[in-house]
Amino acid sequence: MRPLAVVGPTGTGKSDLALGIAEALSGEIAVEVVNADAMQLYRGMDIGTAKLTVDERRGVPHHQLDVLEVTETATVARYQQAAAADVDAIAARGALPVIVGGSMLYVQSLLDEWSFPATDPQVRARWETRLAEVGVAALHRELAAVDAAAAASILPTDGRRIVRALEVVELTGRPFAASAPTIGAPRWNTAIVGLDWETTVLDERLRRRTDTMFERGLVEEVRGLIGRGLRDGVTAARALGYAQVLADLDAGGDGEAAREPTFVGTRRYVRRQRSWFRRDHRITWLDGAAPGNVDAVLRLWRQRRAGAPRPAD
């Protein structure tokens, strides 16, 4: 069974579209969803990631949700291996795997079957120590000195990716980008659709989404996760919303002041997602505001299933 992938920026309605597809195919083909949102991998990180509740999943099986504790580090390599096994198992039992998410590296690693550069714990630890000593901005400048292209593609505030880039450069002797695959035929011949909205409309959706998270108890969720080790999490503690609430609580606030930084950070992240996904010529884009998106996706998937080429844009 050839999979379907629903990708695109945060807040565009990808999960709802996937559920609509499952309902439209009910009685014809069973559908199972494979999550491709890195922060939804974490148990207890529900409100701030807009994770569907069990009831909201409408009986559709979901995979790669709630598989990590907040103290564990999420890695693209681990996700790729586990999610690929899920896709293969779903297809083997005659169901349709629908990959849903907007975590850029996670999506592409799965669809392009990335092979990952070697890692060395000692080299990684040395660069992490260097990060702690000089700070993220200085380490970003050090990366720029040895790999300008990598530095240009990594945010100066993203210490984890800066460390990884420096580790790869040291271990391989090549630029970080040289380890990344090119975009080719998608794994499993997956049909890929992207969902997006006009910018001003999406910004308003993101504003409402952020407000809803805080009204539903994001601050209380973060407080509860602190007791489970959130501050010690390398990746979980940096998640949008969680990082901002943590910072406000640590500064003596009640968490409410994190609302605006969370919205601004989410909007900035959406711009990065758009830039990333728009370069992928394999994606067929849909307007989130348009009617009939479920039917449009199913037409594309049926064409791909029958072996027809992707229609020209």
From Swiss-Prot:
Its EC number is 2.5.1.75. It catalyses: adenosine(37) in tRNA + dimethylallyl diphosphate = N(6)-dimethylallyladenosine(37) in tRNA + diphosphate. ATP binds at residues 8-15. It is an enzyme of class 2 (transferase). Keywords: ATP-binding, Magnesium, Nucleotide-binding, Transferase, tRNA processing. One of its GO terms (biological process) is tRNA modification. Substrate binds at residues 10-15. The keyword Nucleotide-binding applies. Its cofactor is Mg(2+). Catalyzes the transfer of a dimethylallyl group onto the adenine at position 37 in tRNAs that read codons beginning with uridine, leading to the formation of N6-(dimethylallyl)adenosine (i(6)A). HAMAP family: IPP_trans. Belongs to the IPP transferase family. This is tRNA dimethylallyltransferase. It comes from Mycolicibacterium gilvum (strain PYR-GCK) (Mycobacterium gilvum (strain PYR-GCK)).
